[in-house]
Design a protein with these regions (language model features):
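Conserved alpha/beta-hydrolase
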Residues: 73-91
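Catalytic histidine-centered segment of alpha/beta-hydrolase-like enzymes
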Residues: 245-254
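The serine-hydrolase catalytic nucleophile loop
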Residues: 57-69
Length: 279
């Protein structure tokens, strides 16, 4: 089972090896109070506009290394990638995991205090991190410049389960699985109900919003894009369907993501890194 999701889990050893000879390395810090610990990695001057990256399930803040390592993005953004509660060293009240989308979103709000620029924050969430990003944006819309959801799992009627899903709930099997995998399983089995709670939220999102979905995504049903079109009421929204893309769009279409982030007029300029066939 773990091999199915190994690409989403990055060990500390792999991180050390990756940055062993790097000239610029992310700064890893812990935001902590009496009940909350948030592990974050940041790179770029903190006086630059913040780009906040929220991972899926399972996942890690290091799942965005390719974006954090991009020199052009480093020059223009204070890039902050966070371990959601239940992943890495991020915890809330010593709980192993938190399945509530609202609680997850509220737990991330202290990160906004790290924004020392005069501009609002760009929030990017992918997969299971997308609805958490959206909920967070709905809580502090005045602090957010734009919302980008990549391969979002947001339709409560399109939750996918696999042959191995039920085994992930077995307490004996869980003893041999990475903690992040068990956290993801807990999230998955409550996700549809949590997404139903999100239904009234979508109409309250009015910041510029971009939704990107792949046609060959085996985790997020492509119809999640139709759900977004129907429920998001922002007049400044765009929807991008990549016919041949899978789930890992932030890797396979990194140049497109990068160009989107660097565009100062996101909703007026054409995204040239995307070819006319939507590949």
């Amino acid at each position: 089972m773990t091999s199915c999701f190994s690409r989403y889990l990055i060990s500390e050893k792999q991180v050390r090896q990756h940055y062993a000879n790097a000239e610029v390395k992310p700064k890893v810090t812990i935001i902590k109070d009496d009940t909350l610990s948030l592990s974050i990695a940041s790179i770029g001057a903190d006086t630059l506009p913040m780009l906040l990256l929220i991972h899926g399930a399972p996942g890690s803040l290091w799942g965005y290394m390719n974006l954090m390592d991009d020199k052009d993005l480093q020059k223009h953004f204070h890039i902050v990638s966070v371990d959601r509660v239940g992943y890495g060293k991020s915890r809330l009240k010593k709980r192993k995991f938190v399945t509530s989308i609202e609680t997850q979103a509220k737990a991330l709000l202290p990160i906004f205090a790290l924004n020392h620029s005069e501009q609002r924050v760009t929030v990017l969430g992918r997969s299971y991190g997308a609805p958490i990003a959206a909920k967070m944006v709905s809580l502090v819309p005045d602090k957010v410049k734009e919302l980008i959801m990549v391969s979002p799992v947001i339709d409560p009627d399109k939750e996918k389960f696999y042959w191995f899903s039920k085994w992930g709930r077995n307490s004996f099997v869980q003893l041999f699985l990475p903690g992040e995998f068990n956290t993801a399983t807990a999230e998955k089995y409550s996700h549809s109900d949590e997404l139903k709670k999100m239904l009234p939220v979508w109409q309250n999102i009015h910041v510029p919003t971009t939704v990107i979905q792949g046609g060959n995504d085996w985790i997020a049903d492509p119809e999640n894009l139709d759900f977004a079109r129907k429920h998001i009421k922002s007049k400044r929204a765009q929807y991008i369907f990549l016919h041949n893309a899978g789930h890992m769009i932030t890797y396979t279409h990194a140049s497109m993501i990068k160009e989107m982030l660097l565009k100062s007029l996101l909703f007026q300029d054409k995204i040239t890194a995307l070819d006319v066939k939507g590949q």
